[in-house]
Regions:
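A detector of single, family-specific signature residues
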Residues: 1-199
Length: 199
């Protein structure tokens, strides 16, 4: 068995491979390309644990580790940094530190959801982004109406059926360019409504 640690970045990973007694076998920079990672993992002992920090691109890296019959260990990055206590950080020191924590049995890991669940999690995350965008657009329309003292509509929901009818009437009272921009914001909100309903 070998201990493998990945200090992953956006475009590359620095890999460190060590023996159970801590002897460094090799360190290698791997460009973020599936084939390059497969080739690297193909030279590693099957069943070896691979520590990977929870950076934004860990999904595909974990998939490749599993496909290579190695054991992914998803690291809680902040806790690991505290435990390593390094002041002068470098990629090599990070990877070596992760391996040291693995060998000591103190590597702070988090649960790795199965691939199907990771995929499903994108649905609520995307819905949340769309809802946030819609809220920003609604707030902008509220601010536009307030700028021109047209915000005194007698409705509880400006973007409900009755509120939108009143809002379209108020658009005629806005200056032409502002009305044009607000109409486009309203169209975006309607488009986002349909998209959010699809989730």
């Amino acid at each position: 068995m070998q201990y493998i640690a990945f200090d992953a970045h956006k475009h590359y990973t620095l890999a460190s491979v060590a023996t159970p007694d801590g002897q460094l076998v090799r360190e290698e920079r791997i460009e973020h390309d599936r084939e390059a990672l497969r080739q690297f993992l193909g030279r590693c002992e099957r069943g070896s644990p691979v520590a990977v920090e929870t950076v934004g691109n860990w999904y595909w890296i974990v998939d490749e580790i599993e496909a290579a019959a190695c054991i992914p260990k998803l690291v809680h990055a902040r806790k690991a940094k505290l435990m390593m206590g390094m002041i002068n950080k470098t990629d090599k020191l990070d990877a070596r530190g992760l391996n040291r924590l693995q060998r000591n049995g103190t590597l702070p890991t988090v649960w790795i959801p199965p691939g199907a669940l990771r995929d499903q999690r994108d649905l609520p995350r995307t819905r949340m982004v769309l809802v946030r965008q819609r809220t920003q657009l609604k707030n902008r329309i509220h601010a536009t109406l307030a700028k021109y003292a047209l915000h005194d509509l007698e409705v509880s929901d400006l973007f409900g059926a009755r509120g939108r009818a009143l809002l379209r009437q108020r658009l005629a009272l806005l200056p032409p360019h502002t009305a044009y921009a607000t109409e486009h914001l309203l169209e975006q909100i309607e488009s986002l409504d349909r998209q959010v309903d699809g989730f």
